[in-house]
Amino acid sequence: MTIHSLEDLPAEGVSGRGVLVRSDLNVPLDENGVITDAGRITASVPTLKALLDGGAKVVVAAHLGRPKDGPDPKLSLEPVAAALGEQLGRHVQLAGDIVGTDALARAEGLTDGDVLLLENIRFDKRETSKDDGERLAFAKQLAELVSPEGAFVSDGFGVVHRKQASVYDVATLLPHYAGRLVADEIRVLEQLTSSTERPYAVVLGGSKVSDKLGVIESLATKADSIVIGGGMCFTFLAAQGYSVGTSLLEKEMIDTCRRLLDTYHDVLRLPVDVVVTEKFAADPPPQTVAADAIPADTMGLDIGPGSVKRFAALLSNAKTIFWNGPMGVFEFPAYATGTRGIAEAIVAATGKGAFSVVGGGDSAAAVRALGISEGSFSHISTGGGASLEYLEGKTLPGIEVLGRPQPGQTEGGGPA
């Protein structure tokens, strides 16, 4: 699929031009509102800097969390504006609203090389509305912030699988381009789906089988092996007839897991041992047991050392690796060993020439939390859900729209 890229925009000249950029600045905050992981802010900088250095008047739209009933002071983008300004090396204005009088006045007052961050885009319910008309009306107001002759740059890969006003609808109204982050993500994922060097190993973790079912079924016919860890492995173990104690279990998915094991028994790889404890907390003493001998009064919170050793050996021979989801509750030091072991095995394989992709979300957070160099992997995605849906073969609305003719053009590129 051919999409319009950011490299096409400077050719037309951005100096003095208003550019609306949809970034993914959805960073985690602690109880005091302090950013605990600025990875997504860092990832947004190259596109913004390129536009600002070119003299564009940049208006940034982004969200934080999931506001339920309109504006929520705890989800204001104020700390994000400060952090973004530090990384850009210039002042970032924060509008007090999204498309209201403050945002309009600030947008009109921008000079070349200025940047304005709108308040949390999801404070307006129309952003995520299922009603096409509501979303389009909101998108038109967003487009007005960079009119006349405005442009739209999509650089929030973590939201391109959402059909939302600032992701999809605004791209139907303005000349649209993929930012550097989005273009790079697409290039990497295309490599995982169309030009994969084998052996191809996939590592899947996280809590629920239901969240990963689509990608398991899609990749089981493409990958040479799929390692299953994290909370989801216990539903697979239960499908084999094993008792899993009080471990996380999706009973409604047991039959599905049994079918997957029957169909893809030569591809799926399950843990041979797990680390268990009596309650979900950081302090109870951990115990390593065989995967088929989990005590009834315990829950599994990590894969065991035997599993790490077996999976690491498999990964050492891989030429392509995709990893999405931690192997255990890495936030608790006693149950981070499995995730660390798998991460280090992928790093080692990468050092030997393997192409490795960390599929965003909790996996990327785990890499940073465990102090593992991000540069040790070939690519760390900023979009967990978007990456999975792309690999499933789904159409991502925010990507599909970037391949459409620019407003006023036909499919052939000429005027309408």
UniProtKB/Swiss-Prot annotation:
Protein's UniProt keywords contain ATP-binding: yes
Family in the record: Belongs to the phosphoglycerate kinase family.
BP term (GO), one: gluconeogenesis
Designated name of the protein: Phosphoglycerate kinase
Pathway info: Carbohydrate degradation; glycolysis; pyruvate from D-glyceraldehyde 3-phosphate: step 2/5
Keywords: ATP-binding, Cytoplasm, Glycolysis, Kinase, Nucleotide-binding, Transferase
Residues that bind substrate: D24, L25, N26, R40, H63, L64, G65, R66, R122, R162
Record localization: Cytoplasm
SUBUNIT field: Monomer.
UniProt: ATP binding residues: K212, G300, E331, G360, G361, D362, S363
Listed Pfam families: PGK (PF00162)
Class of the enzyme per the UniProt entry, highest EC level: transferase
Chief localisation class: cytoplasm
GO molecular function, one term: phosphoglycerate kinase activity
